[in-house]
Amino acid sequence: MACLKFGLPSQNLQFTGRIKELQLLSAIVEGAGKGQRKIAVLHGLGGIGKTDIAVQYAWQNLAVYTSVWWIRSATAEGLKRSLMTATQHLIHHLAANYASGQPDYIVIARDLGIAGLIDASGQLVDSAESNDQERVEGALSKWLSMDGNDMWLLVFDNVDDLKVVDKTRHFPQCSSGTIIITSRRRGSVHWGTGSIQVEGLEKDDALSLLLTRASLDQEQLNATGE
């Protein structure tokens, strides 16, 4: 079965270097004991390449996971929107793969902890109630915590305000799966079972990246001149 993907940025085919960081990230994920949830934190200056590394890791390991969820977490509003859209994506997925053919949205809503918040067409009901919004935000976490659903990857990208993500509500309350967090805040390391400080590219990797981009620019210029 193909991996279910939500929000995962396109793979950068010109990605260069970062072998050490990718190896460390794999070591954190693979080194966790059986029954231990794996949480890897990539922290460093803004624009240093944390997101790029997380994207590359996800694409390199797509065959390992049954689902990959990319949650934009720079602001509270952005996180809320991302989780709501992810929940809607999940509802469509569950409906399309419903065992009896015709999806029962009442059952789907109940299983996701959002009873009364999915209409007859499978769309989330717009509710201004804070409790309803919190339930929708927690629906993905609830689904990822279900028995047998253990080979997933959940990425919280750009968690630069550590108050935005609520570990109790937004992290699946189970011992399975993998979470990756990217953040500028060094304090985020306390959230992980392992952390990586991301620094600038090695000199050879930086040169290789420049040459690759220069080659692409030249190809584009040549194509324009033809």
Spans of model-derived segments:
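Short conserved motifs of the RecA-like P-loop NTPase core
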Residues: 220-226
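Conserved NTP-binding/hydrolysis module of P-loop NTPases
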Residues: 77-123, 214
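A conserved switch/coupling segment of P-loop NTPase cores
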Residues: 2, 12, 20-37, 44-47, ...
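Short beta-strand-centered segment that lines the nucleotide-binding/catalytic pocket of NTP-utilizing
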Residues: 71-73
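Conserved lysine of the Walker
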Residues: 50
